[in-house]
């Protein structure tokens, strides 16, 4: 669920708006839309020094504020329904966006997010950390990955729908029809443009696809991310100041960010950097995983995941196994759409015994002086992936 493709859309288009029609009043209004929250709950001293590369945690939150039953009943909780760790290389050639399965088990660090909550630490699922505030999610992701997080961006369900509607809808191509009454989702096969509500349902549906697990929908979320990147950076948006402003007004109203991204000028500076990355240099991939010992409904990071994170930490390109990045499927066939909107905390998620779901092609490393690296033993990494320039209707 998009949730997360917000990196290429929010940041790039913020730069376009500010540089193109950047009146002071416009900047002040858009900056005033943004909600801020601390980046971290603890001291900075135990974190690696910042380098020329950047790591941004994207959070799609399922705070239960929506009235529609199809998106889950309100229960006052707040969890990250989607998490993406986006790595921007120092050379400006690559963005590697790693999806982190929300049902990943790990030892969550103790956390006290001022104004949000505190947690004493312990074994738990990655997505539960957000219930104590974004800083606790940042701490949990750093614990899982060993990668420094420089910024975070959070968008909730209502914000996501507003963003898609402000874009004028999200063009997608579904190889197969989708019918999921639990998510109020009934979509035909083929090319179509989805409004915000259907795009969210598509991004969340579990029961209409695959084995009904949370893992099954990650490839579908890659499809939605790619579609958002393509639509938000299209001439239909960028060449129309009115549409661009509507999009950015909706987007900034939906954002919770750390103080380092709290102003349009901050987003514009980062957006200028993001806008120079070619679409073929943006790769979405799923964290390699395996079934958690003793709990097939949960997953843990695999040895290949450790290799992925090592490369992010030292800003090295990642070599992915297989043919070409693009279809985002678990078995090499094209994906059809995302998982559902029911309150799916993992009750019936059935993780496969080996979780690196699909083979994908080499991540683009154009312009990088480094040689793409694979796993710790030198083999290319096998996981689900697609490039941002994927033709969603191809094949």
Residue spans of the language-model regions?
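Non-catalytic, solvent-exposed segments at the cell envelope interface
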Residues: 1-395
